[in-house]
Regions:
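Aromatic-lined, polymer-binding surfaces characteristic
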Residues: 210-220
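Proline-centered turn/helix-capping motifs that create local helix->coil transitions or kinks
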Residues: 21, 25-26, 62-63, 80, ...
Length: 255
């Protein structure tokens, strides 16, 4: 009898051990906890964090005035200067010892912010924890930020591609994700129209806790400045003046 019991017990113990190992090595539970856009935008807290990430893309090299390290604007005159050596030093700008890689993070951050804002605009309506007024305000803020990122890009790089407002799939090939550069007028027209839409839903003032968020006045001010720059032949050369920037045309002959 003992001879029969021992193999049975051994098999049971091994079976339990294999089962427990199988449960331990299973990764299915991690995928169940993984965030999705639907989970994020059904939560008020996560939606607010997503909007905060959009604002976060305005930091560092996208700020007009900031601490010495990040903004090259601080080197425009002698009012402020920092250490004479280091990652971004006063002497490097003073003696022209810099290249285009020093501030190219701005391009990446702007398109990151554009993508974040577009995703919020497309998905925030499913949130049942936010009021209709809050949803309208969040969408307007995201719309303002998306347009403002294009304004920053236009000022620094001239005409840039206007990417589709729907989310671009990262599974596509290079051709499907490659978009041609739009003309100067097309980019400004987009900024102008989007800022008008944003201004319609943005408040004129915000409380002290939200004082740094977009307002109606901010949207209209950016629109006015973009249109002012567009009217200048220095920033936006016209066909009637072909001598200026004639080498900076695309394959269709557009400046």
């Amino acid at each position: 009898m003992k001879k029969h019991i021992l193999p049975i017990v051994t098999i049971l113990v091994l079976g339990l051990g294999i089962s427990s190992c199988s449960d331990y090595l299973s990764v299915e539970r991690f995928f169940k906890d993984r965030q999705s856009e639907e989970k994020i935008f059904k939560s008020k807290v996560f939606t607010e964090q997503w909007l905060a990430k959009c604002y976060n893309c305005l930091l560092e090299t996208n700020l007009e005035i900031t601490r010495i390290f990040y903004s090259t604007t601080n080197f425009a005159d002698d009012m402020i200067f920092n250490e004479t050596s280091g990652a971004i030093s006063y002497n490097a700008f003073k003696f022209g010892q810099y290249d285009n890689t020093w501030t190219n993070n701005s391009y990446i951050r702007c398109y990151e912010g554009i993508r974040q804002a577009s995703i919020l605009i497309s998905n925030v309506d499913i949130n049942e924890e936010l009021t209709e007024e809050e949803i309208a305000d969040y969408k307007a803020q995201a719309r303002f930020l998306r347009s403002y990122f294009y304004w920053l890009l236009l000022r620094k790089y001239g005409p840039v591609p206007l990417v589709p407002e729907e989310t671009i799939s990262i599974d596509g090939d290079y051709t499907s994700m490659s978009y041609p550069r739009n003309s100067y007028d097309e980019v400004v027209d987009y900024i102008s129209k989007e800022m008008v839409l944003a201004a319609q839903a943005l408040p004129e003032k915000r409380d002290r806790q939200n004082i740094n968020r977009a307002t109606k006045g901010a949207a209209l001010a950016v629109r006015a400045k973009a249109l002012l720059y567009t009217a200048s032949p220095i920033n936006n050369p016209r066909p009637e003046d072909p001598d200026k920037f004639s080498d900076f045309t695309d394959h269709q002959g557009r400046i």
